[in-house]
Design a protein with these regions (language model features):
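N-terminal intrinsically disordered/low-complexity leader segments
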Residues: 1-30, 163-167
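Hydrophobic/aromatic-rich alpha-helical bundle segments in the mid-to-C-terminal region
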Residues: 3, 125-130, 141, 145, ...
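Alpha-helical structural segments
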Residues: 30-41, 45, 59, 76-99, ...
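Ser/Thr-centered, proline-biased regulatory motifs
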Residues: 49-55
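Helix-turn-helix DNA-binding module
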Residues: 57-58, 138
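Short hydrophobic/aromatic patch on the recognition helix
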Residues: 61-71
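Short helix-capping/turn signature of helix-turn-helix
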Residues: 71, 130-136
Length: 214
């Protein structure tokens, strides 16, 4: 789980007292973040089975009803994780676009960023490749499909300018083929990472792999 947004509430030290102090109740926004953080932590356990709201509530030491005060359904919880993935990744994509000129170098940095993001967030990786969504609402998988479609489109746009300058007779087609190949490579690396129990890092031999493709 990343340490940028989904950070659990820090415990507050209290002085010993004759009577036990009441547990501090998190604010609504803090509780939502705590729920998502815990869900992502549970997803990153190798071999984790389908996560139920009962198991999530037990981990948080709250009732299932308490979860539903913050999310209408478990699908909405997964949507919260997907939103975090989308916002994090495409914010970084935009930063790369501002720093790097369009071309193969920019495309390589986008792919590397995506794989490093997944490597640092194993629980999110299971959402990205769909393993965690198998038994959930179909729209969640559709949304992740759209995420990778957008990644592919971004890579195509990045590569198109370089191919135009290189004198390609079919720059649009060539850019599409390369973008599709890079996206398939990235998805394959994420799937291997998840299905190896997070033992095979997606960034393994990354520079050499990208050099062969670009």
């Amino acid at each position: 789980m990343p340490d940028t947004q989904l950070i659990p509430e820090s415990p507050v030290a209290v002085e010993p007292a004759p009577a036990p102090a009441a547990r501090k109740r998190p604010k609504p926004g803090e509780r939502r973040v705590q729920i998502l953080h815990t869900l992502a932590e549970m997803l990153q356990q190798p071999g984790a089975e389908r996560i139920t709201t009962a198991a999530l509530a037990a981990r948080l030491e709250v009732s299932e009803a308490a979860l539903y005060r913050h999310f209408a359904s478990k699908a909405q919880m997964f949507e919260g994780l997907i939103e975090f993935i989308e916002q994090s990744v495409f914010t970084l994509v935009n930063q790369i676009g501002e720093r790097e000129p369009a071309g193969t170098g920019q495309a390589a940095k986008i792919v590397a960023m995506l794989l490093h993001f997944a490597e640092k967030n194993p629980g999110m990786t299971r959402v990205m490749v769909g393993d965690a969504l198998v038994f959930e609402n179909e729209r969640l998988q559709q949304r992740m499909n759209q995420f990778f479609d957008k990644i592919e489109s971004t890579l195509k746009q990045s590569l198109r300018g370089a191919l135009d300058g290189a004198g390609s007779a079919t720059p649009g087609l060539d850019a599409q083929v390369r973008a599709s190949m890079l996206t398939a490579f990235a998805v394959g690396r994420l799937q291997r990472f998840a299905r190896s129990g997070f033992k095979r890092p997606p960034s393994e031999h990354l520079e050499a792999s990208l050099a062969r493709m670009l």
